[in-house]
Amino acid sequence: MELVLLDEETLYEYIFERYVELEANANDLSQDLGILSRNESELEIDIGPHRLVTRKKKAPERDEYTFSIHQNLTSLNSNRDNNNSTTGYVIWTTSTFILKWLLYNDNATIFTRGGVKDEVDITSIFQCQQDDKLRYVLELGTGTSPMFPIVFSNYVDKYVATDQKDILPRLKDNIQENQSECRRRLLKSNTIALDDLKRRTELECQIDIALLDWELFSGSKKSRNDPVLQCGPNFHLTIIAMDVIYNEYLIVPFLTTLESLFVWYTEQRVTVSALIGIQLRTQDVLEMFLEEAIIERQFIVHAVDEKELNKSRFILLHVNLP
């Protein structure tokens, strides 16, 4: 695996090569838009490692998860719900693929546990022995999926899932329904009614949902003053966003919000990094996104060049501000 620094020249080479790979693997990949199921409102989703039957030494045990998720297909096809922004009402394959990759691909430990790769110093997403800071994950455009919030709450001290107003009640319901899949920590919340589940640990995760509208956040003191978003300098924050860039109109609001979050938290002496997962659809949209992020806004972007990712229709970007 390599971390490829994208700049105003290499970003075009990267995009070209990635779409060549996509075309080469086309026969093995689904050609739909990436919705996990267009037919079912109630989904049962298993998150676990891919098992190969071999004679080699038994692989180490990894935590596995089973989710019961309600998605709203009616709202997806509505022209009235959530001001026409309806993609968050259903579950997308980007989330399941990237989540499994982060949990079960050995190359992903550079992100979950931290370290140095290709001269890039990466702070871990999960709480570990890398440093004495607490771990906070802020997810942008969570949708109604509880998978990242619940799985990551096993390993971090604070998790905030954000989206638009009409999405949040359904997200809350799905988190409540699947809270038992957090087995390594006690869940606490100021925004979600949780059961008093017993765990053999004193470790806790503060899990919350919050309204974060990309059109409003950068100039809104009200959004920034939400106590759910607050944290102290003893935290490292990882901002994650999965499959939120699928048309050109989202690029500027998303990057403006991301930039504002980096600046805002840095001013509070919180260290910040970001991971962005994207499904490869229209090449022009990806090109416009990277141009805006790298050339116009000076984000430091590294693309994850890794075998399993390269055979898929997904990319993963590690992002920082200088």
UniProtKB/Swiss-Prot annotation:
Gene: RKM5
Organism: Kluyveromyces lactis (strain ATCC 8585 / CBS 2359 / DSM 70799 / NBRC 1267 / NRRL Y-1140 / WM37) (Yeast)
Residues the entry annotates as binding S-adenosyl-L-methionine: W92, G141, T142, G143, D163, W214, M242
Name the record gives this protein: Ribosomal lysine N-methyltransferase 5
Gene3D superfamilies in alphabetical order: Vaccinia Virus protein VP39
Keyword Transferase appears in the UniProt entry: yes
Keyword set includes Transferase: yes
GO CC annotations, alphabetized: cytosol; protein-containing complex
One of the record's GO molecular function terms: S-adenosylmethionine-dependent methyltransferase activity
Family, per entry: Belongs to the class I-like SAM-binding methyltransferase superfamily. RKM5 family.
Function: S-adenosyl-L-methionine-dependent protein-lysine N-methyltransferase that methylates 60S ribosomal protein L1.
EC number of the protein: 2.1.1.-
Keywords tagged on the record: Methyltransferase, S-adenosyl-L-methionine, Transferase
Biological process per Gene Ontology, one example term: methylation
First-level EC class: transferase
